[in-house]
Amino acid sequence: MNADFMIDTNVLVYAVDHSAENSSKKKIAVDLLASVDFGLSAQVLQEFYVTVTRKIRKPLSQTQALAFLERLEVFPIIPSSYGLVLQGVRNSLKYQLPYWDGAILAAAVELGAKTLFSEDLNDGQLYGEVRVSNPFA
């Protein structure tokens, strides 16, 4: 279960966000998803579902969100596990990050990804084996 790149929640959210203020980010996200060999984590999928059905300006219906999630089944997905939780905590301590960001980094390592596309972490920073790239910067 390997992929060169891991996608963070915000990239997926922008790909389906229909609000005008995020239209340029939507295009970037859609183009990125169409052009790279990426993987995901269960955490990213969970965060995506909650965000697009409850938190964005024009929420998706639960059925629309489910349909999008079902299309992601073909990509490598790192499940949540006890080991991943522990490594997420270790990462949060080591890098002084919120736990959730530490867990995303742990999943990226497990996936074998060298690049994590995210706008939530420092663009260009190397966290162990994983470099963060902000596609919206």
How should each PLM-predicted stretch be described?
Residues 9, 42-50:
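Short, conserved active-site loops that position catalytic residues or coordinate cofactors/metal ions
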Residues 7-8, 41, 97-98, 120, ...:
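Histidine- and aromatic-rich ligand-binding microenvironments
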Residues 49-75:
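Active-site-proximal, substrate-binding regions of enzyme catalytic domains
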Residues 27, 74-116:
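Active-site neighborhoods of divalent-metal-dependent phosphate/nucleic-acid chemistry enzymes
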Residues 1-40, 55-63:
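Short, well-structured N-terminal submotif of metal-dependent ribonuclease cores
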Residues 2, 105-137:
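Acidic, PIN/NYN-like endoribonuclease modules and their adjacent C-terminal/linker elements
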